[in-house]
């Protein structure tokens, strides 16, 4: 009996079969234990003691801290500030399925769930012990034993006469096989936030690194380039957008210093020098939202137009567009992009301060749009003010803007004004600040849309309202029913977020 016990051992670990050929008798020995596994909630593993062929165990794979490190880079890379790709070599043991090469294509369509998916790793390789065989790499977090296969998968295996027995394989990993987040999490100090996301502007990755990440900035930049096809330059913003022209000073972390770029947004093409103008790819949805509010024939005044993400789509929609930007570079690229998108005949472009634009070209056009001769006008007038840090201050330009002018229109202009807020109730905060500047409550006139979360406790919002006649036509008696138009359809208010 003792000699028999020496040939067996019990373990709580899951059985894994090495990459070796297994005798048929060995497989038969294991089958009676299948029901016992379920009852005991443990796996009695039998070791067949044979000099040529043997069973061995593989650590049970669970979702715990140790297992989550299976595909983590070696611990030696912690604290690395200059990227050394050779330091990321590592060998891990993963489950594999042995199959005949002629069934691989049919089988892989049914094993998408179970197959390993890692950057740069082939899911099927040649069996080193059998030139006619293949090894299918399996996901070690999903595939433990034969029972890990789903019913449909087992059915396919049976149809193709494939033994569902799982073997193990030593897989060599290199830098190319790790994801950017895994690399940075392994390099940066434990417990620190990891930067794996960025704003993509053509070939440029725009990062906004925090203080604790700065010692690793060049490594982070290179990783972003390595792991994102098409990215050839990584830059970091090194000051806030608070200057006159809304662009920011940036540092090239890695890659080429060429900041001339081309982007596609909502089927339109924009070209510009990213180091000299403002562009935020995270506003793509907002650009589209405003465009959808416009109808052919409407008039759009874009007070802070940038390189044209509001103006050009509006012109393509057959709106009359007046676009302005104070930055000479933005003005230059706005003209260029209008030609590039073939709307240069539909957009009037200005290079003025926002307030001068409102009190000059906008006022002159409104006098025509809202004058007595425009009684039959059916289209709407929209004014977009996308300068979140300061746009609300420019609302004062509407006060008495048309004072002394005849009030002959029914549809007053609709303003879309953007702002940031750190208030606990950001929508109410924006409404109150806008009302303070205008000197009139906007509660009955406005709706507030949450554009995006900029940072913890900081929101970007858009307040939309039809300018009250009492603001535009100061000290004049007006018929509110005729001049203020229908109430705006409410979008998202402070109650919605």
Curated annotation (Swiss-Prot):
UniProt xrefs under PROSITE patterns: SAM_MT_TRM5_TYW2
Chief localisation class: mitochondrion
Localization annotation: Mitochondrion matrix; Nucleus; Cytoplasm
GO molecular function: tRNA (guanine(37)-N1)-methyltransferase activity; tRNA methyltransferase activity
Binding-site residues for S-adenosyl-L-methionine, renumbered to this chain: 287, 325-326, 353-354, 386
Function: Involved in mitochondrial tRNA methylation. Specifically methylates the N1 position of guanosine-37 in various tRNAs. Methylation is not dependent on the nature of the nucleoside 5' of the target nucleoside. This is the first step in the biosynthesis of wybutosine (yW), a modified base adjacent to the anticodon of tRNAs and required for accurate decoding.
UniProt-recorded name of the protein: tRNA (guanine(37)-N(1))-methyltransferase
Organism whose genome encodes this protein: Bos taurus (Bovine)
């Amino acid at each position: 009996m003792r000699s028999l016990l020496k040939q067996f051992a019990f373990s709580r670990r899951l059985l894994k079969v090495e990459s070796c050929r297994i005798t048929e008798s060995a497989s038969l020995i294991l089958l009676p234990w299948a029901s016992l596994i379920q009852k005991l909630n443990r796996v009695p593993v039998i070791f067949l003691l044979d000099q040529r062929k043997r069973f061995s165990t593989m650590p049970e794979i669970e979702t715990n801290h140790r297992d989550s490190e299976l595909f983590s880079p070696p611990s030696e890379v912690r604290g690395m500030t200059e990227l050394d790709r050779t330091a990321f070599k590592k060998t891990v043991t993963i489950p594999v399925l042995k199959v005949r090469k002629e069934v691989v294509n049919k089988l892989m369509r049914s094993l998408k769930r179970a197959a390993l998916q890692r950057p740069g790793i082939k899911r099927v390789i040649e069996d080193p012990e059998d030139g006619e065989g293949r090894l299918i790499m399996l996901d070690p977090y999903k595939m433990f034993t034969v029972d890990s296969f789903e019913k449909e998968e087992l059915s396919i295996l049976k149809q193709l006469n494939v033994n569902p027995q799982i073997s193990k394989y030593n897989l060599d990993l290199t830098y190319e096989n790790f994801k950017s987040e895994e690399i940075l999490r392994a390099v940066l100090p434990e417990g620190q936030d990891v930067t794996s996301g960025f704003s993509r502007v053509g070939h440029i990755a725009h990062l906004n690194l925090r203080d604790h990440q700065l010692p690793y900035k060049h490594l982070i930049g290179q990783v972003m380039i390595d792991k994102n096809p098409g990215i050839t330059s990584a830059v970091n913003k090194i000051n806030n957008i608070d200057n006159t022209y809304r662009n920011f000073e940036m540092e090239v972390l890695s890659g080429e210093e060429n900041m001339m770029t081309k982007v596609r947004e909502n089927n339109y093409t924009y070209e510009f020098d990213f180091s000299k103008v403002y562009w935020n790819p995270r506003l793509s949805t907002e650009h589209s939202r405003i465009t959808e509010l416009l109808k052919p024939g409407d008039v759009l005044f874009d007070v802070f137009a940038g390189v044209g993400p509001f103006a050009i789509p509006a012109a393509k929609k057959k709106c009359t567009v007046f676009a302005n930007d104070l930055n000479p570079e933005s003005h230059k690229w706005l003209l260029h992009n209008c030609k590039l998108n073939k709307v240069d005949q539909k957009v009037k472009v200005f290079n003025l301060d926002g307030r001068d634009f409102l009190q000059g070209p906008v006022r002159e056009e409104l006098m025509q749009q809202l004058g007595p001769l425009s009684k039959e006008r059916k289209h709407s007038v929209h004014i977009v003010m996308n300068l979140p840090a300061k746009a609300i201050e420019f609302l004062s330009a509407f006060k008495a803007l048309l004072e002394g002018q005849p009030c002959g229109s029914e549809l007053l202009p609709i303003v879309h004004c953007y702002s940031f807020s750190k208030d606990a109730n950001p929508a109410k905060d924006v409404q109150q600040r806008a009302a303070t500047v205008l000197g009139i409550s906007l509660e009955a006139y406005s709706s507030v849309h949450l554009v995006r979360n900029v940072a913890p406790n900081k929101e970007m919002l858009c307040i939309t309202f039809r300018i009250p006649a009492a603001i535009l036509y100061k000290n004049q008696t007006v018929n509110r029913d005729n001049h203020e138009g229908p109430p705006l359809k409410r979008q998202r208010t402070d109650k919605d977020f």
